[in-house]
């Protein structure tokens, strides 16, 4: 039997208001960093342990996180992230796991000196026969402040946009083993050229 949740099964994280980026959202994240907030949730038809296990191996994340170029896992708590930014640039930071409970949640924060100060939490809640509700909350400081955030949004590289897309790709990958795309793969292009 699953423990009762204060949230409906498919609801997003409790604190999703951009107006309260420093309030309840930050209160749920140890060592919270960032003034902008985004929160997303998706139900994935897989058991909690499978989803948690895949996500906890941070080297797996570039497989479904479109803007993540690479993640170098340094140890059980520390990893180095390289992420695409607008205008062909990249941003980098070291992230440290600040708190976790196996099969329940992982919280992290960027280390001092990060080009994008950020922190976040991903939660995995049993949804019975429907699988697992995966909720993601991210706090971040966009490079360039509000202007940088607008540019990132225009370039489709803003974390709120990416979080939604990345969770949907995570769902596709875990449920079907692949991520749907409108792009042709090499074999399809060669077949069409023949």
Predicted regions, residues:
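Hydrophobic ligand-binding cavity/cleft-lining segments
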Residues: 2-78, 164, 169, 173-194
């Amino acid at each position: 039997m699953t423990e009762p949740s204060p949230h409906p099964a498919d609801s997003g994280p409790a604190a999703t208001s951009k107006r309260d980026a420093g309030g309840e959202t930050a209160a749920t994240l140890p060592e919270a960093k960032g003034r902008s907030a985004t929160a997303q949730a998706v139900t994935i038809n897989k058991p909690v342990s499978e989803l948690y296990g895949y996500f906890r191996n941070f080297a797996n994340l570039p497989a479904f996180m479109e803007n993540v170029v690479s993640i170098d896992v340094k140890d059980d708590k520390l990893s180095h992230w390289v992420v695409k930014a607008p205008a062909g640039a990249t941003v980098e930071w070291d992230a440290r796991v600040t708190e976790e409970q196996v099969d329940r949640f992982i919280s992290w924060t960027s280390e001092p000196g990060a080009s994008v100060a950020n922190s976040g939490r991903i939660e995995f809640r049993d949804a019975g026969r429907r699988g697992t509700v995966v909720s993601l909350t991210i706090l971040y400081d966009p490079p360039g402040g509000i202007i940088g955030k607008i540019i990132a949004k225009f370039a489709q590289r803003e974390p709120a946009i990416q979080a939604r897309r990345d969770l949907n790709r995570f769902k596709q990958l875990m449920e079907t083993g692949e991520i749907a795309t409108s792009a042709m793969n090499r074999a399809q292009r060669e077949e069409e050229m023949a």
